[in-house]
Swiss-Prot record:
Effect the entry attributes to changing R43 to A/E/H: No effect on electron transfer
Subunit structure: Forms a complex with heterodimeric ferredoxin-thioredoxin reductase (FTR) and thioredoxin.
Encoding gene per record: petF
Impact noted for substituting T49A: No effect on electron transfer
Stretches assigned to the 2Fe-2S ferredoxin-type domain: 4-96
Cofactor: [2Fe-2S] cluster
Protein name (record): Ferredoxin-1
């Protein structure tokens, strides 16, 4: 099992946190376990509350059912169902940017 460095950036609050996330754990779950409060609602990849934008790196979010292909190509991720597949940098709190 690999572990990756996930950097979570909240531009609105000016915060940046680095966490370690195993490749078999969702980013949202790992962030909560490490004391970081990210937005969420359904925890099933079926809404956009936890949306973030990938700045760099790759994730597996094949469990999600909300984002369309254009949004995924634009770099949007649902942290509740995203596994890191490399070190990643994600801008959090991006739900409003989807619309």
């Amino acid at each position: 099992m690999a572990t990756f460095k996930v950097t979570l950036i909240n531009e609105a609050e000016g915060t940046k946190h680095e966490i370690e996330v195993p490749d078999d754990e969702y980013i949202l779950d790992a962030a909560e376990e490490q004391g970081y409060d990210l937005p969420f609602s359904c925890r099933a990849g079926a809404c956009s509350t936890c949306a973030g934008k990938l700045v760099s790196g790759t994730v597996d979010q094949s469990d999600q059912s909300f984002l369309d292909d254009d949004q995924i190509e634009a770099g949007y991720v649902l942290t509740c169902v995203a596994y890191p597949t490399s070190d990643v940098v994600i801008q959090t709190h991006k739900e409003e940017d989807l619309y």
